[in-house]
Amino acid sequence: MPEKGTVVMSRYELGRSLGHGTFSKVYQARSLVSGETVAVKVIDKEKALRAGAGMVDQIEREVAVMRLVGRHPNVVRLHEVMASRSKIYFVMELVRGGELLARLVAGGGRLGEDAARRYFHQLVAAVDFCHSRGVYHRDLKPENLLVDDDGSGGGGNLKVTDFGLSALSASRRHDGLLHTTCGTPSYVAPEIIGDKGYDGATADVWSCGVILFLLLAGYLPFFDSNLMEMYKKITNGEFKVPDWFTPDARSLISRLLDPNPTTRITIDELVKHPWFKKGHTKRPASSNTMKLNEEEKPANAAMNMKPASLNAFDIISLSQGFDLSGMFCCHGHSSRTQDQLFVTGKPATAIVSRLEEIAETEHFTVKKKQKKRQEEDGMAVKLQGWKEGRKGQLAIDAEIFEVSPSCYVVEVKKTAGDTLEYQAFCNRDLRPSLNDICWTSPATAASEKNQLPAVSEVSPLSSPRN
C-alpha cells in the first residue's frame, strides 16, 4: 500500500491513514487540482482478483450503487474512481466526525431522545432515498454511519457509507425477493436468517430499528455469546425495552422490530409515527431540480434551422466507449448516465411529430425550442410533465442531430424531476413508442433483456489497454 506523501494518478497527495480492511486502506488526501481534502480508498487489485469473482462483483457493485445514491446529503459521496495497473482508487467525501458508534461511546453509551431522533431522521431519509433508487444497503450498523463535523455545535449530520454489500433491485429473483445472506449478525433481520428470500426494504427497516434501540438504550436488543441463541432471539423477536423509553418510543421500536416482515412498519408508515414526527421537517427539493416557471432562453436568431451535424468524434463521444453498435438502437445511453440516444433514418419532422404524439398520451405538454422554417420543424423540443412526481414535475429535452441525410441521432435528457421516474418513462413509454422508427443492432437487442446499470465505461478491475 502507498505511504503518506505519495501522489497517486498525479491528482491526489495522500495524508494520514484513516483505516484499513482486508484488501484496502483509506487515507485522508488533498486534491492537487482544487486543494480540496478528500478520503481516498486504495484497493489492492491483485488481492481483490485473487479473492475471486465475488470480491470483483462487490467492488463494481459498490461503485454502481454510490453513483446511484451519492448525491443525497446523508450519503457519503463518491467523487471519482481511478485505476492503475495495481491499485483501484475511490475518491470520496471526507467525513471528519468519525463513526456514530464512537460518538455513542463518548457520550456514555447512549444518546438523549432528541439527539437520537435527529440522527434517526437522517438515517431514514438516506435509506428511503436509496430504496427509491432500487438500492438496499443490507449492512446498516453504527460502524457504517459517519457523522460530519459541521462546526455548528449541533452534533453534525449523519452520513451512510460502505455499500459493498448493497443489492440492486435487479438482483431479485423471479419471486421478487433477494436471496443472498449477508449483514452483521446483531443487526440482521429474521427473514434473512431464515434463508427463504426477503425484501431488501423491510430488512433495512429492521436494521434501522436495531440502530434506534442502540441509540436510546446504549446496548443491543439482541445479544448472546452463543450465536445460534442470538439468532433464535432475533427470529422470535425476543427483546426487553428499558424503563426509560417513552411510550411513543416503545411503540415505534415494537413496530420496527416486528419479526414478521409482512406486518413490520414501512418507511411510509414510519414517517407518520408520533415519535418520528416530533421535530421532523421535510427536506426541500434537490437544488438541481429546475424551476418550472423559469423562462426558456431565446434561441440564437442566427442559428441554422437544420439539425446540428455530428462528426465522427462527436459520435464516438456519445457512444459507450468506442462501440458504435450501442448507438443504433432504442436503448442507447450517452456518456452522461441520464441521457438516452435514439438513431433513426426518419427525417426530423417525423421525429418531432412522434414526440408530440407521445407527449399527448403521456400527460406532457410540448414546447418547440426552434420555430418552423421552410418545411423544417424545430430541431429541439421540451416535454413538460404536468403531474407532480417525487421531485416535482418531470421535464425532458430532446435534441435532433443530423449524422447524414439518411441518419439522425436523437438525444433525450432529463432537465427536471426524479431520475427514476424519468427512466421509467423512457423504458415504459418513450422507447416502445419509438421502436418502429429506430434502428436496433442484433447485439444490443440480445443484451436488452438483462440490462444492469453501467458501473463505468471501462471496469476499474480490467487490465489497462496497451
From Swiss-Prot:
The keyword Kinase applies. Residues 297-329 form the NAF domain. Residues 337-366 are annotated as: PPI. CDD domains: CIPK_C. Pfam families: NAF (PF03822), Pkinase (PF00069). It comes from the Eukaryota. ATP binds at L18, G19, H20, G21, T22, F23, S24, K25, V26, K41. GO terms for biological process: signal transduction. The active site is at D139 (proton acceptor). Its cofactor is Mn(2+). Residues 12-276 form the Protein kinase domain. The activation loop within the kinase domain is the target of phosphorylation/activation by upstream protein kinases. The PPI motif mediates the interaction with the ABI (abscisic acid-insensitive) phosphatases. PANTHER family: CALCIUM/CALMODULIN-DEPENDENT PROTEIN KINASE KINASE-RELATED, CBL-INTERACTING PROTEIN KINASE 5. This is CBL-interacting protein kinase 20. It comes from Oryza sativa subsp. japonica (Rice). The gene is CIPK20.
